[in-house]
C-alpha cells in the first residue's frame, strides 16, 4: 500500500524507535549516469542504472529476498555520506573494486550536480529466472547487473536542483 507521500526523516526515526524494530530502510529511486575517475561512462548491460538511495541497504527487499547477496565490502548505513554498492558484473565489466570512486549525475544535460561516491560494497546476483523463490524481475527493463545502492545523502545530492526553473527535459 502506498499513499505516494514522502516519509520524512522524523517519521523514520519515530518508526525505528518502536520496540521490536530491528532495522529499517527507506528508498529513493534515482536513474543517474555513472562515470569513472577518467570521466568515461561506465559500460552497462542495457539501458541505464537503477539506483536505490538507501539508509540501511541490508534491509532493502533485494537483499532480504535473497535476490542479491553482498559478497565484498559493507552495506550502506545511515551514517555513510557517499557510499555506493555495485554488482559484481558491473565491477568486472569496468575494472572496479572497493575504494574506487565513481561520479553520478542524475541528468547530465541539466544543471543537477555531480556526486562522487566511493564503492564500499559489491553484490552478486543470486536471483535466477527459473527459480520461483528468487524470481528474476521480468517486469523491469533494468538488468539486475545495473542496480546500485547509494547512501541516501548521495541520492538526495543527485536530485538537488531538479525541477527548479529552466530544469528538466
Residue locations for each model-derived region?
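Basic-flanked hydrophobic alpha-helices used for secretion and membrane insertion
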Residues: 1-169
Amino acid at each position: 500500500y502506498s499513499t505516494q507521500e514522502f516519509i520524512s526523516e522524523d517519521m523514520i526515526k519515530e518508526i525505528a524507535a518502536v520496540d521490536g524494530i530491528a532495522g529499517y530502510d527507506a528508498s529513493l529511486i534515482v536513474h543517474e549516469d555513472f562515470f569513472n575517475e577518467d570521466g568515461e561512462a561506465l559500460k552497462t548491460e542495457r539501458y541505464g542504472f537503477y539506483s536505490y538511495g538507501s539508509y540501511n541497504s541490508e534491509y532493502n527487499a533485494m537483499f532480504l529476498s535473497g535476490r542479491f547477496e553482498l559478497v565484498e565490502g559493507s552495506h550502506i548505513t545511515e551514517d555513510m555520506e557517499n557510499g555506493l554498492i555495485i554488482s559484481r558484473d558491473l565491477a568486472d565489466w569496468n575494472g572496479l573494486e572497493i575504494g574506487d570512486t565513481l561520479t553520478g549525475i542524475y541528468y547530465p544535460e541539466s544543471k543537477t550536480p555531480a556526486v562522487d561516491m566511493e564503492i564500499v560494497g559489491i553484490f552478486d546476483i543470486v536471483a535466477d529466472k527459473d527459480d520461483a523463490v528468487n524470481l528474476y524481475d521480468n517486469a523491469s527493463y533494468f538488468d539486475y547487473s545495473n542496480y546500485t545502492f547509494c547512501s541516501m545523502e548521495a541520492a538526495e545530492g543527485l536530485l538537488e536542483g531538479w525541477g527548479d526553473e529552466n530544469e528538466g527535459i
